[in-house]
Amino acid sequence: MNRGKMKKVLALMLTFIFVISATACGGATKFDAEAYVRGVMDANYKQKYDEYAKARGISEKDAKAEIEDTLDEQVDTELSGLEALGDFTEEEKQEYKDMLVKIDNLAKYEVKEAKEDKDGNFTVTIEVTPSDVYQTLEDNSTAVAQEMMDQGQDVSQADASMFQDLLIQSMQKSIDGNTYGDTTTIEIAVTKDSDGQYGISDSDME
């Protein structure tokens, strides 16, 4: 799993809107930081939406829609930077999205515990076993491009379709050859603002 992406996911989803609210009996709903972080990560990396939906107070269908909408926006943003190649078809966008999901599924992590401080903020400990899938993508892209040129294709004049083919093949090579590094432990600070809304701390975004 790419650490940078993981923190981006947490930053995006933890700031969605989880506000401590009053229960019917007049008490406060206890924020379960460990369950929520695990739910966020499982929804994004494993397409498991039950714990995330429960924490958000929404249906699993709506939880899935939220995550997929976020991924659709990611795909559109990334491909919009390649306008010079021409337009990507909806089928090509979906194929790229499917490959991103495959890469996400390689993520290995375990949410260990959440410790609350006196101010009601949390430090969540996560064990991460990093994948090298993104680290090998550049080398695999070079290899695939060479294979295409050996077949007579001029990759220097690639349009959207040819680039898509190169990209998908490269991603698949990285997935097929994926290996993992040593397990490391990271800590994510989940803090509460003046409105009672939780979010990831700015320091964890550095």
Language-model segments: which ranges?
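Subset-of-secretome marker
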Residues: 28-206
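Bacterial N-terminal signal peptides that target proteins for export
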Residues: 2-13
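Enrichment for repetitive, rod-forming helical segments
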Residues: 14-15, 196
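C-terminal motif of bacterial Sec signal peptides marking the signal peptidase cleavage site
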Residues: 21-24
